[in-house]
Amino acid sequence: MATPSGTATATTYLARDHARAQAGTEVDAMPVLPASRWPAPPEGVAAEDVVWAETVAGGNYTHKVLARGTELRLTDLTGDACAHLLLHCADRPWERLNVADTVKVLWNAYLGEGHLLLSDQGRVLASVTWDTSGRHDALTGTSSLARNTVRYGDGTPQSASPAGRELFKLAALKHGLTPRDLPPSVSFFQGVRIAEDGTTEFTGSAGPGGTVTLRAEQDVTVLLANVPHPLDPRPAYTCGNLGVLAYRARPTSPGDPLWEATPEGRRAFLNTADHLTARGIA
C-alpha cells in the first residue's frame, strides 16, 4: 500500500477521503470478511460453514472464540511459519491449556495427530485430528521480550521483532484477560526433540504446505501468535505467513476412535462430557 503524501492527508476531510479510498484494498495477510468468502473451503465443507479465514503475517497475532465442534486448520504457507497457540474456555477463562498435563497425562511430549490438548481440570479443550507436518513443540513455549531484545535488538509488539508473549498479551486483552492469564503455550510447524543427553534439539520445519487440524471439544478462546521459534538458530527474525481456517463440524463423541485411543484420553473425554452434561450443553 502506498504511503500518503503530506498533502493527501493535510486536513481531516482529505485524511478521511484517503482512508476510504483504501476500502477495497487487499493484501496477502489479512482476515477475509465474511469468512464464507474464502475461495477454497476444505472438501465437504460448505462455504457458509466457514467461520474464520485469515492469513497471519510473521510477527503478528490473531484471536477468535470458537464454538464446540469447530475445526481449526492451520497451514504453514511458506515453511517458515510458527503458530504459537493458547486456549481458554470461552466462558470461564480460568480453565485453560495446561501444557504440563497435556504432556504428562498422555505420556507423550510430542504433539501430533491424535493428541489431546488438556486443561488443568483434566478436560479436553481441543484434539489434533490431522497433521501433515510432524514438527511441533510442547516443551519450550514462545519467545519473551528479554530474549528477543538480546537476539534481535527489540521484542516489543510494535518492533520489527515482536516476542510471542508480548503479542499474546495484546490478544488476551481483547478478551478481558491479563498477563497472569497466560500459561505456557504450544507451537506448531517448528519442531524440537529431546536428545539422549537431555538437551533440546531444534528440528525446524517440514517445509511449506504443512497443515494441522484441531477440533474444539468445548467453546474456546483461541490466541495465536505467529513468531519465530525461540530456538530457531537463524540470526535474522524469520517467520512466514500462517493460514488460519475454521469451520463448523462436530465434537468427538463416544465411538469415535479418538475417544477410545488411550485410557487416559478416554478419561479426559469422560471428564469433559460429564462437565458439559451437567451444564446442559451436551
Regions found by a protein language model. Name each.
Residues 2-282:
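Intrinsically disordered, low-complexity segments enriched in small/polar residues
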